[in-house]
């Protein structure tokens, strides 16, 4: 059925708690004037939350969920422009701390 809210078999996507954490961070950064748009994608092996300064640009950051790395390096990663992994771990809240004020600054 086309309107079935469940993800297709084999698809990876974010859970409600994870989306809540991501949207809280996004709202805080939009209020600070640093971010303008976002996008989410659920793929067969990972899910991606992309963050944009302008909708027509490449993403500034990507928050990736890769369940196959959960027992290794951690399923969560924040990836910057150019594919640089800024932080990786097992807990989303800890990984998102890379965006805490004073720890990281966007440079144009």
Regions found by a protein language model. Name each.
Residues 77-106:
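Mixed-charge, glycine-accented linear interaction segment located at domain edges/termini
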Residues 62-83:
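Short aromatic-glycine-(Arg/Gly/Cys) micro-motifs in beta-strand/loop hairpins
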Residues 1-48:
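Negatively charged, low-complexity tracts enriched in Asp/Glu with abundant Ser/Thr
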Residues 1, 42, 73-74, 84:
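Intrinsic low-complexity, intrinsically disordered or marginally ordered coil/linker segments
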